């Protein structure tokens, strides 16, 4: 029986994380969920937010993940998302600028795709939260 989970965080461009983990916490659409080894299999949607995991050396890791999906199996969790960034790779100034652009777009009310603007705002806010954690 495996003692750890294999965690894969994959975007269309690259594999961001491929590591063994003791525990993974992810931002599900119904709330944050945690996964340990031998978890019951399930598939769920993810919302933009923080993905935390503890590796086999007890080191904690933090990433921003965007919308996507997570497949949980007893010995692995695969996270498929549009984008993912490790905390240390987030450009805080760029995230702040994205938040300001999204807020201005929502406030203007002119020819605004509110769903897209709100999604952009949510992503920017979550990136800022992860960068500041």
Swiss-Prot record:
Keyword terms of this UniProt record: ATP synthesis, Cell inner membrane, Cell membrane, CF(1), Hydrogen ion transport, Ion transport, Membrane, Transport
Q: How does it sit in the membrane?
A: Peripheral membrane protein
Quote any Pfam family the record assigns.
ATP-synt_DE
Cross-referenced Gene3D superfamilies: ATP synthase delta/epsilon subunit, C-terminal domain, F0F1 ATP synthase delta/epsilon subunit, N-terminal
Subunit structure of this chain's protein: F-type ATPases have 2 components, CF(1) - the catalytic core - and CF(0) - the membrane proton channel. CF(1) has five subunits: alpha(3), beta(3), gamma(1), delta(1), epsilon(1). CF(0) has three main subunits: a, b and c.
Family of this protein? Belongs to the ATPase epsilon chain family.
Q: Please give the function described in this protein's UniProt entry.
A: Produces ATP from ADP in the presence of a proton gradient across the membrane.
| Protein name in the entry | ATP synthase epsilon chain
Organism equals Desulfosudis oleivorans (strain DSM 6200 / JCM 39069 / Hxd3) (Desulfococcus oleovorans)
UniProt gene name: atpC
